[in-house]
Amino acid sequence: MTNLVLQLRRIAGIEVVANRAARRVVMVAAFALLTALSAYVAVPIPGTQVPVTLQTLVVVLAGALLGPGLGAASQVTYLAAGMLGAPVFSGGAAGIAWLLGPTGGYLLAFPVAAVVAGALAGRSGANRIVATVRLGLALAAGAAVILVGGASQLAIITGDAGAAIALGVAPFLVGEVVKLAVAVVIAARLRNRTLELV
């Protein structure tokens, strides 16, 4: 009887590990897909080649809801799909060349932004207000990483840092604040549940 119980526990433990690994793969793939879908919600901004998308919201949520490692993995998966030819970038674009253009710096910053948002968000604490403020600051830091990455590449392409900030950061600030507010609400509600899953 004891051997049977030990064998069942061992089998159940293996099953739990397998289920956890499967959940992680599914969550990484789901956030890669959400990032791709959010690229199709693109609003052009006059005077700049970079549209407003919902991608920032999804990227920082990936970090906050999956944690830094899996959040980054979801964004690396997204970028790999685009580099391999899947039409996942804004407007259905694909290919490595897209990462070398005006939007490439933003895209390449996605995995780093997910790590920053996930790492700074940490675990929820007992004080809900403090945890929500911390979450908001973590998501804002992740969004800032994306803007800095985008502006940096624009500065390299244009040779003008001032123009890069004027065209690659300033037009997006109001939209980023709105997206971050939505992201904080979503993350505050789902964070504990998703972190338990992965």
Q: Over which residues does each language-model region extend?
A:
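Alpha-helical transmembrane segments in multi-pass membrane proteins
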Residues: 30-38, 59, 63, 74-82, ...
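Membrane-embedded alpha-helical hairpins and interfacial helices in multi-pass inner-membrane proteins
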Residues: 48, 123-198
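Hydrophobic transmembrane alpha-helices
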Residues: 2-72
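Short helix-perturbing small/polar motifs within transmembrane alpha-helices
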Residues: 3-17, 37, 96-148
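Structural signal for the C-terminal ends of transmembrane alpha-helices
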Residues: 65-69, 116-124, 189-193
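Alpha-helical membrane segments and adjacent membrane-interface helices in multi-pass membrane proteins
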Residues: 42-116
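Peri-membrane helix termini and adjoining interfacial loops of integral membrane proteins
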Residues: 1-8, 83-88, 158-163
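Residue-level signature of transmembrane alpha-helical entry/exit and packing/kink sites
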Residues: 20-28, 52-59, 71, 102, ...
